[in-house]
Design a protein with these regions (language model features):
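Extracytoplasmic
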Residues: 10-44, 231-237, 355-359
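Residue-level signature of mid-helix packing/kink "hotspots" within the transmembrane helices
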Residues: 27, 54-63, 146-147, 259-267, ...
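Extracytoplasmic gate region of multi-pass secondary transporters
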Residues: 29-30, 212-269, 352-360
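Conserved MFS/SLC helix-loop-helix module at the cytosolic interface between two early adjacent transmembrane helices
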Residues: 60-98
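Cytoplasmic membrane-interface "Motif A"-like loop-to-helix N-cap segments
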Residues: 71-82, 274-288
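Helix-loop-helix hairpin linking two adjacent transmembrane segments in secondary transporters
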Residues: 97, 138-186
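Flexible cytoplasmic inter-helical loops of multi-pass small-molecule transporters
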Residues: 182-204, 403-414
Length: 415
């Protein structure tokens, strides 16, 4: 392995570790809703709304992150994002509802630089034939953090760890990660074929947004992500406790199986896609499997399959949501890689930002503010199934960008 290749691997691994950390903080509030409710004097719905503020920073700053990395390079930008996540964690653990709200938004704004940065490194420093595999592996790190945020943090909190101590500790960890990123990310050459002015940035955004394939990628990814970001990470534990009757620890473990499935599915589906040289069949196949498993999670019996199987299968299938990140990169100009990733991330998590409060409000309405039952959750989250079905239909309109796709069917990069 050449020195340049080793440097690229180290850079990608560091960004992936940062993504792991960010995802841990993204999912951790889901296992401490009772503690947060007591600390802030909020209902479970109020805490869910506060936690959902993450996406109000994450979604719009996807555009900022992509453009900034294209213009300035990874070394100048990614460490700032990690520092922001650390500061946001410290604010969240301050005990003040106002500071926690601001901190949650800052966590989202800083956290987006992890995925965009890691994908940027994967798509600019490695061969195109490895793109889907590396992007899937990146999400594997993220979902490992998401699983840790439930599977590891849950027992810590239930075992007596103070929730403020957790957030303070993680805030310090974020600042340390920022320093490590700054010290070890390589400085990029300034000779990349991309401009550095405002006009060039606007041109990149215009080119990516005007490409219909970009919009399709964002919508498909968003519809496939929502079952995880809203149903599992915010309401999963409560659903399993209130609607299915599981004890807290068992509910946490079962809920964390979806991120565990992502850990398997993201690199697996990415590798399959690279292996067969096609994107669409893997996206559609994964989405169909997600639709079936989510329908079973809402309406099926809990004792028919071995424990944790449904969650793991849903998570594996959800890995298909990362393939649009590869497609959008292949459907646009190479020098717009960061911008394209930012755009698909923006469109993706706009779904989570907008729909999170909506699902919370619906659940509150159908339950009448009383004790929530299985039927209430089914009525509230059934639209997620329609969303996955819509993603399957939209995927049929994607143009194949894989290496073995028909030339006539490929989307030429926007010029």
């Amino acid at each position: 392995m050449s020195q340049a290749a080793k440097t690229a691997v180290v850079a990608w691994l560091l960004a992936a570790v940062y993504y792991f950390y960010q995802y841990t903080l993204r999912s951790a509030p889901g296992v401490m809703i009772p503690q947060l409710s007591e600390a802030f004097g909020l209902t479970a719905l109020g805490v869910a709304s506060l936690v959902g503020l993450f996406y109000y920073g994450y979604s719009p700053f996807s555009l900022v992150a992509g453009a900034a990395i294209d213009r300035l390079g990874a070394k100048r930008v990614i460490p700032i994002g990690a520092a922001a996540v650390g500061i946001g964690a410290l604010l969240f653990g301050s005990g003040s509802q106002e500071a926690a709200s601001v901190g949650r938004v800052i966590q989202g704004a800083g956290g987006v630089f992890a995925l965009v940065g890691a994908v940027y490194i994967a798509t600019t420093h490695f061969p195109p034939s490895r793109a889907a595999t590396l992007i899937g592996a990146t999400q594997m790190f993220g979902m490992s953090g998401g699983s840790a945020g439930q599977f590891v943090v849950g027992p810590l909190i239930s075992g007596g760890m103070n929730w403020q101590l957790f957030w303070t500790t993680m805030g310090i960890v974020g600042l340390v990660i920022s320093v490590v990123l700054y010290l070890f990310l390589p400085k990029e050459e300034s000779a990349r074929a991309v401009g550095h002015g405002v006009k060039d940035t606007v041109r990149a955004f215009s080119g990516v947004f005007r490409n219909p394939q970009s919009i399709l990628c964002g919508m498909i990814a968003g519809l496939l992500f929502v079952p995880t970001t809203i149903f599992d990470m915010i309401w999963g534990v409560r659903y399993l406790q209130e609607a299915r009757g599981f004890e807290y620890v068992d509910a946490v473990i079962r809920s964390s199986m979806i991120p565990v499935g992502w850990i398997i599915g993201c690199p697996l589906l990415g590798a399959i896609s690279d292996r067969i040289g096609r994107r669409k069949p893997v996206i559609i196949g994964g989405a169909v499997m997600l639709l079936v498993s989510m329908a079973w999670a809402l309406y099926g019996k809990t004792d028919l399959f071995p424990p944790y199987i449904v969650g793991i299968v849903a998570g594996i299938a959800s890995g298909a949501a990362m393939l649009p990140y590869t497609v959008i990169k292949e459907a646009n100009r190479p020098e717009w890689s960061g911008t394209a990733t930012g755009v698909v991330n923006f469109l993706n998590f706009t779904f989570s930002a907008l729909l999170g409060p909506v699902f919370g409000w619906i659940l509150q309405s159908v339950s009448g503010g009383a004790e929530r039952e299985l039927s209430h959750y089914q009525m509230t989250f059934e639209p997620l199934l329609y969303g996955v079905a819509l993603a399957i239909v939209l995927a049929m309109f994607l143009r194949e960008t894989g290496t073995k796709g028909a030339v006539a069917g490929r989307q030429k990069p926007e010029k």
